């Protein structure tokens, strides 16, 4: 993931762990919605359901640098209403799709604002990482569960399956020792900022059936080691240049409400894996969509010269077979994007744990998943129209060729008939 510049406008989404809002908070034109964070229930509903991913058959090469979302560049802010269940339709209409580019001044909590002003590239090495990798079409979840259970003593694993997501704590004791009982590392970025806990003593894994793994609290070395460990469970492994990555940093503080700001995730409780689960679902969907964006970019590169070729020469060098293959690949991409429920729909866990839904939706909004999917479909539709036009043109050319053959055969038959008549006339004269 490309780190955003400190002087760029920064994107900000709020995740709140308390349904109630302060009575003395003043209403303002720009408001924020504090979303409920679930209690640390520690319960799970496990099942082995899920669907396999459909992938393009042709090998693609990676041409981009990751997710195509504006929060990586311009980092726009979509403000949310202050009340979590507000029913004032007029206020919702006024705030809908409102975008702000000076988010730091919009943060009313002084400690949060001071920390937001300080956080930047220079602090990423101080904070624990939250990284998502898309490495394959899918994972063999049953074998993964069995392997993680076998690692219980070595890595302190305790796997739980939430539909298409497999959760477990995971610790590399050989590299970091047993930190589970050490004191928290607390720092302050600013004298007026909040107390920030930067300890990574709760490393958590979220493995998604559709080929994505999200790691919380891992070092880069540990991330690479784990990716090597799960290679044997990958189905249709991606080439190294095709692997997609989303990088965030996170920290824990009780000084202000949780949020996602400039790719920094603020949590109130670092040990609450249910909150991490809801955030991880959105991040996993985002990194999977990044793969689709790369595939679409590659398809555009392959077809961008066709209109110019038609304009200059009036002909197309592609054969009908190549065009049909390209059309088939486009349909596969559309199926992956629109019909694969794990990538687009709210996860099943949100039905059984509805208190997680606001956190998931806020993260999903930050990552601009709906907008990116809509843009992907528009681009695919343009390419599809082009290829369909080429297919029809080749069909017309084939029809013209058949007509030419028929005319030629008729001409030959007429010529033969004329020759026969001439021969008969000459024979009758003799």
From Swiss-Prot:
<feature type="region of interest" description="Disordered">
    <location>
        <begin position="1"/>
        <end position="73"/>
    </location>
</feature>
<dbReference type="Pfam" id="PF02582">
    <property type="entry name" value="DUF155"/>
</dbReference>
<feature type="compositionally biased region" description="Polar residues">
    <location>
        <begin position="46"/>
        <end position="73"/>
    </location>
</feature>
<dbReference type="GO" id="GO:0030435">
    <property type="term" value="P:sporulation resulting in formation of a cellular spore"/>
</dbReference>
<keyword id="KW-0469">Meiosis</keyword>
<feature type="compositionally biased region" description="Polar residues">
    <location>
        <begin position="18"/>
        <end position="28"/>
    </location>
</feature>
<comment type="function">
    <text>Required for sporulation where it is believed to have a role in meiotic nuclear division.</text>
</comment>
<comment type="similarity">
    <text>Belongs to the RMD1/sif2 family.</text>
</comment>
<dbReference type="InterPro" id="IPR051624">
    <property type="entry name" value="RMD1/Sad1-interacting"/>
</dbReference>
<protein>
    <recommendedName>
        <fullName>Sporulation protein RMD1</fullName>
    </recommendedName>
</protein>
<dbReference type="InterPro" id="IPR003734">
    <property type="entry name" value="DUF155"/>
</dbReference>
<dbReference type="GO" id="GO:0005737">
    <property type="term" value="C:cytoplasm"/>
</dbReference>
<dbReference type="GO" id="GO:0005739">
    <property type="term" value="C:mitochondrion"/>
</dbReference>
<keyword id="KW-0963">Cytoplasm</keyword>
<dbReference type="GO" id="GO:0000329">
    <property type="term" value="C:fungal-type vacuole membrane"/>
</dbReference>
<keyword id="KW-0749">Sporulation</keyword>
<dbReference type="GO" id="GO:0051321">
    <property type="term" value="P:meiotic cell cycle"/>
</dbReference>
């Amino acid at each position: 993931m490309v780190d955003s510049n400190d002087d760029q406008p920064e994107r900000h989404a709020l995740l709140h762990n308390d349904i109630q809002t302060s009575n003395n908070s003043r209403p303002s034109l720009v408001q924020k919605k504090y979303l409920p964070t679930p209690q640390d229930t520690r319960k799970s509903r496990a099942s082995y359901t899920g669907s396999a991913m459909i992938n393009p058959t042709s090998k693609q090469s990676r041409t981009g640098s990751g997710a195509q979302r504006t929060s990586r560049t311009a980092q726009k802010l979509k403000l949310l209403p202050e009340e979590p269940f507000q029913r004032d339709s007029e206020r919702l209409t006024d705030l809908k799709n409102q975008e702000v580019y000076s988010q730091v001044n919009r943060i009313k909590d002084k400690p949060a604002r001071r920390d937001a002003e300080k956080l930047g590239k220079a602090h990423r090495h101080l904070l624990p990482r939250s990284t998502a990798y898309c490495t394959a079409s899918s994972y063999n979840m049953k074998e993964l569960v069995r392997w993680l259970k076998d690692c219980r003593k070595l890595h302190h694993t305790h796997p739980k399956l939430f539909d298409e997501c497999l959760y477990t704590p995971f610790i590399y004791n050989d590299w970091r020792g047993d930190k589970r009982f050490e004191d928290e590392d607390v720092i302050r970025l600013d004298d007026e900022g909040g107390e920030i806990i930067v300890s990574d003593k709760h490393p958590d894994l979220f493995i998604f059936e559709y080929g994505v793994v999200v790691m919380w609290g891992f070092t880069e070395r540990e991330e690479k080691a784990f990716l090597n460990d799960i290679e044997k469970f990958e189905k249709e492994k991606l080439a190294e240049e095709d692997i997609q990555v989303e990088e965030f940093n996170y920290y824990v503080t009780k000084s202000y409400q949780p949020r996602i700001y400039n790719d920094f995730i603020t949590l109130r409780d670092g040990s609450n894996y249910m909150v991490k689960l809801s955030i991880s679902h959105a991040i996993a969907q985002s990194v999977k969509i990044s793969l689709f964006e790369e595939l679409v970019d590659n398809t555009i590169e392959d077809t961008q010269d066709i209109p110019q070729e038609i304009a200059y020469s009036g002909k197309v060098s592609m054969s009908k077979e190549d065009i049909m293959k390209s059309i088939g690949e486009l349909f596969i991409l559309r199926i992956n994007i629109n019909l694969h429920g794990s990538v687009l729909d709210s996860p099943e866990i949100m039905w059984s744990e509805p208190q997680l839904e606001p956190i998931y939706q806020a993260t999903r909004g930050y990552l601009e998943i709906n907008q990116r999917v809509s843009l992907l479909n528009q681009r695919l539709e343009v390419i599809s129209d082009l290829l369909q036009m080429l297919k029809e043109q080749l069909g017309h050319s084939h029809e013209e060729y058949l007509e030419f053959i028929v005319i030629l055969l008729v001409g030959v038959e007429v010529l033969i008939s004329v020759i026969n008549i001439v021969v008969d006339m000459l024979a009758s004269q003799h």
